[in-house]
Amino acid sequence: MSNPQPDDSNNRIVAVTLDEESIGRSGPDIEHERAIAIYDLVEKNLFAPEGAGEGPFTLHIGITGSRLMFDIRREDGTPVVAHLLSLSPFRRIVKDYFMICDSYYQAIRTATPDKIEAIDMGRRGIHDEGSRTLQERLAGKVRIDFETARRLFTLISVLHWKG
């Protein structure tokens, strides 16, 4: 006999905002990636802050000093919890991610399909590493699935680039 799984249909993010003070000027490729990540995140995600009960939730992401801030609220704006995470574990990953993204965006304009595919595989690998790191940093604080972690990592990368 298996244990029933919790109903996660309400454990999700319904709105995401990024701290405008934390966002640096980005090129159109990065802005496009950010918009897609927000759209995809809101469309499909698993986000369950520990001890918060059921959602849905809103999430405001920003950089405060050298920390990543997740300000989690209920849909009506009632505060749930704010988590501050050190940016140190993300610095190298984000730097590598942006370097390979630059290579990828240059390659899609001029390189062969094989070269583009090789760069894209590397880009996805670094993105996966950042996503796993985020899941580890949120363990015991917020339960998220891997796809949610991937979309959140994209947004963190945009913020961290300025920080």
Swiss-Prot record:
Belongs to the UPF0262 family. InterPro entries: UCP032146. This is UPF0262 protein RPB_4349. It comes from the Bacteria.
